[in-house]
């Protein structure tokens, strides 16, 4: 069971207590949202090192709700590695990367090991890092884009 801890790290010291904005000033298209999500995951895995395997393809799309309450779609990407590094050092490294991207990073309380979740910024909706013995994983959700997840999935299958 994961519980949200009282430990929150804010990306900008000058904005103590303020959460980074999740609103984009310009809309993003499906390809950009997907590519950016992949880049954010790749940046984290490169910094953490090791052999990461895809568990959920970055082509996986699901429904989400736009800030206008309309229907949207987002990409999901999950990678994992079976050999673990230094769990605490990896959690600190991942958090530092995401804070530098303007994201708010929260540490979740989990008996298995460090669990970090980052939100905000303008690159992904959410990215999570779980440093559990023998099973480190990173999961990212792209920004929510205008569109229908089922239609996007059908287009991928056709194309």
Where are the language model's segments positioned?
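Sec-dependent N-terminal signal peptides
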Residues: 1-4
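Short, charged, intrinsically disordered terminal tails
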Residues: 151-159
């Amino acid at each position: 069971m994961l519980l949200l801890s009282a430990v929150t790290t804010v990306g900008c010291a000058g904005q103590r207590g303020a959460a980074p904005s999740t609103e984009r000033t310009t809309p993003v298209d499906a390809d950009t949202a997907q590519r950016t999500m992949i880049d954010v995951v790749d940046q984290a895995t490169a910094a953490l090192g090791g052999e990461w395997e895809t568990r959920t393809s970055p082509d996986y799309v699901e429904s989400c709700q736009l800030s206008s309450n309309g229907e949207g779609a987002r990409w999901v990407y999950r990678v994992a590695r079976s050999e673990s590094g230094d769990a605490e050092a990896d959690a600190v490294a991942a958090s530092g990367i995401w804070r530098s991207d303007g994201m708010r990073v929260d540490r979740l309380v989990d008996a298995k090991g460090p669990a970090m979740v980052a939100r905000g910024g303008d690159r992904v909706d959410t990215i999570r890092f779980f440093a559990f013995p023998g099973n480190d994983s990173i999961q990212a959700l792209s920004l929510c884009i205008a569109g229908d997840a089922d239609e996007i999935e059908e287009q991928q299958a056709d194309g």
